[in-house]
Amino acid sequence: MTIGFDGKRLYDNKTGLGNYSRTLFNRLLQFYPEEEYKIFVHQKYFEDSQYKYPAFVDRTIVSDAFSADLWRFKGVEEDIAQHGINVFHGLSNEVPELPSGIKKVVTIHDVIFHKLPKTFPFIDRQMYSYKTKKACHIADAVIAVSEQTKQDLIELTKTPEEKIHVVYPTWNKEYEHECNYVLKEEYFARYGLPRDFVLYVGAVSKRKNFLRLLEAMNLPENQDKHLVAVSNGGDEYGAAEEYIYDKQLEGRVFFLKDLPWYELPIIYHMSQGLVYPSLYEGFGLPILEALRCGKPVITSNLSSMPEVGGDACIFIDPTNVEEISAAINFIYYNLELAAEIKTKAMHQIQKFNPQKMTQKMMDVYRSL
């Protein structure tokens, strides 16, 4: 069987959608090397990519069509047909119309535009709604990254339940490496980080609720604590900078921008734990990553986050600053928590075992 993939996010996206694409592709190569894989991408996204690994490049078809957007919408069909693809997988909420002999799979990561409409301009909401509904309609199989996303899709698109398969994302191989004292010391020095800190990973945006996390850090009981945010900015980054300046938090809040993806597991290991008070997630990969590192996680009691965290997380009302603050205090000073969390985390992450999740994905491909 020859399986094709949309390579835009794989080559061009540094965050969640890109990580999902790269991890899935690498795991398929690891567990199912007997199958053939092809990545289709426009040179606009390929040319300056930092992800030109031999395993990807050797299996990539690069288009030099005049318009990258038009090629992804229509021109890619011809390229896919020419390369003997049996199944084509759109990895991020879109899939092209293809000849009937080529089966189509699409991964839908979330429907944020539907659940939190005020965080999107009207035109964007209409476009995302159209693309999502169309992708679910023309695909032979729809991959939802969580049960929550599956239910959201049924509500929004009326897609038959039997057409939607829940296949959880998993962690990449970097999370399986040990992180010893010497390595941690190297990274404390490299980035000038405080010796103890809680970690945030994600955009500085309204949906991610970062400003409330800053408010929690500014409460009197947290004046001795530090926050490290691994983030490349977002729609509230300016407001966050202003708040940090006004409240004189510069010495306690640190941003790590453009952190190489392979260094992130080390930062998790260095932290006291993850604080992830998002208002909505289709999945919430940082929760899984932190649990894989055996770290305490504070996250929201909304959408998919309880599904991912199970009984291994501390759940809070993300709109309650005092609740966020109390949870930070708890993981900072409760030394007995570490061993308990590690035990629960190791149990919870088995739900997302890489081999099991990759097998579920391959089962979908082979069923078509």
Give the location of each predicted region.
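Carbohydrate transferase catalytic cores enriched for Leloir-type hexosyltransferases
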Residues: 1-368
